[in-house]
């Protein structure tokens, strides 16, 4: 434990919290345009072809966003909305594309957790 004199010489430093989603600039969502839509493979224990898109945001940031759900209609120049939230087994993917908003269609034939995938209530 430091002495009073030591604390006067060098005060305690506040713990600096690093922002996990800097491209959002404290906003809940941001709009952007897809510059490239492709698949990538996850880290070691997992195996799949995960669908991701490189997105140029309205604030000039270029980020990689994950496309959740089965099947999608995204291509280059699609306008999308992103939210924060990383994908644990894809390095560098710190954002999710919101389904059912702007050019992104909702997931077809989705019965449960529909709001997360932009699916309308089945008749």
UniProtKB/Swiss-Prot annotation:
Protein name: Small ribosomal subunit protein uS12
Function: With S4 and S5 plays an important role in translational accuracy.
PROSITE patterns reported for this sequence: RIBOSOMAL_S12
GO biological process, one term: translation
Quaternary state and interactors: Part of the 30S ribosomal subunit. Contacts proteins S8 and S17. May interact with IF1 in the 30S initiation complex.
GO cellular component, one term: small ribosomal subunit
Native source species: Rhizobium leguminosarum bv. trifolii (strain WSM2304)
Protein family: Belongs to the universal ribosomal protein uS12 family.
């Amino acid at each position: 434990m430091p002495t009073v004199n030591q604390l006067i010489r060098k005060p305690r430093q506040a713990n600096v919290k690093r922002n996990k989603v800097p491209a959002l600039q404290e906003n809940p969502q941001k709009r952007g345009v897809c510059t490239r839509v492709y698949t990538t493979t996850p880290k070691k224990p997992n195996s799949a072809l995960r669908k991701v898109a490189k997105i140029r945001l309205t604030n000039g940031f270029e980020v990689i966003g994950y496309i959740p759900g089965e099947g999608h209609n995204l291509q280059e120049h699609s306008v999308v909305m992103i939210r924060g939230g990383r994908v644990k087994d894809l390095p560098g993917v710190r954002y999710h594309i919101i389904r059912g908003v702007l050019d992104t269609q909702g997931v077809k034939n989705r019965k449960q957790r529909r709001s997360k995938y932009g699916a309308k209530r089945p008749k």
